[in-house]
Swiss-Prot record:
PROSITE patterns: RIBOSOMAL_L15. It comes from the Bacteria. One of its GO terms (cellular component) is cytosolic large ribosomal subunit. Part of the 50S ribosomal subunit. Residues 1-51 are annotated as: Disordered. One of its GO terms (biological process) is translation. This is Large ribosomal subunit protein uL15. Pfam families: Ribosomal_L27A (PF00828). Belongs to the universal ribosomal protein uL15 family. Keywords: Ribonucleoprotein, Ribosomal protein, RNA-binding, rRNA-binding. One of its GO terms (molecular function) is structural constituent of ribosome. It comes from Bacteroides thetaiotaomicron (strain ATCC 29148 / DSM 2079 / JCM 5827 / CCUG 10774 / NCTC 10582 / VPI-5482 / E50). The keyword Zinc does not apply.
């Protein structure tokens, strides 16, 4: 045995299917594609959402709603969260930078303070928006509301 007469092991390789090479090959004629129809044609690719001519689901279901391009999204932060943050870091002024540092928001998010919980400290709170109950609770505790 040498490099010039090496052969693959018996049964380890298959001869590839040569289609469309005449009737004598056994794979001529329709070339394993069956008769007619889109799948037998060259360049065929199934379109996304195509259901064989049936009205596709996307067109059967009615349209509804829209995305309001003027919508302003706020990240909600409650008073009890602000209180725990102020206690942990011994703060008298709580602002956007403190929320970012604590990981409550990312740098491009807007903050709305909501009135869930209670404040015990006198705090100056900076945010983009406040609910009426939150603003009242902050001022009742002797603090100030700074709307950015």
């Amino acid at each position: 045995m040498n490099l010039s007469n090496l052969k693959p092991a018996e049964g380890s390789t298959k001869t590839r299917k040569r289609i469309g090479r005449g009737a004598g090959s056994g794979l001529g004629g329709t070339s394993t594609r069956g008769h007619k129809g889109a799948k037998s044609r060259s360049g065929y690719s199934k379109k996304v959402g195509f259901e064989g001519g049936q009205m596709p689901l996307q067109r059967r279901v009615p349209k509804f709603g829209f995305k309001n391009i003027n919508r302003v999204e706020y990240k909600a932060i409650n008073l009890d969260t602000i209180q725990t943050l102020a206690d942990a870091k011994n703060l008298t002024k709580v602002g956007i930078s403190d929320f970012i540092e604590a990981g409550f928001i990312s740098s491009n998010q807007l903050v709305k303070v909501l009135g869930n919980g209670a404040l015990t400290n006198k705090l100056e709170v900076e945010a983009n928006a406040f609910s009426k109950s939150a603003a009242a609770a902050i001022e009742a505790a002797g603090g100030t509301v700074v709307k950015l």
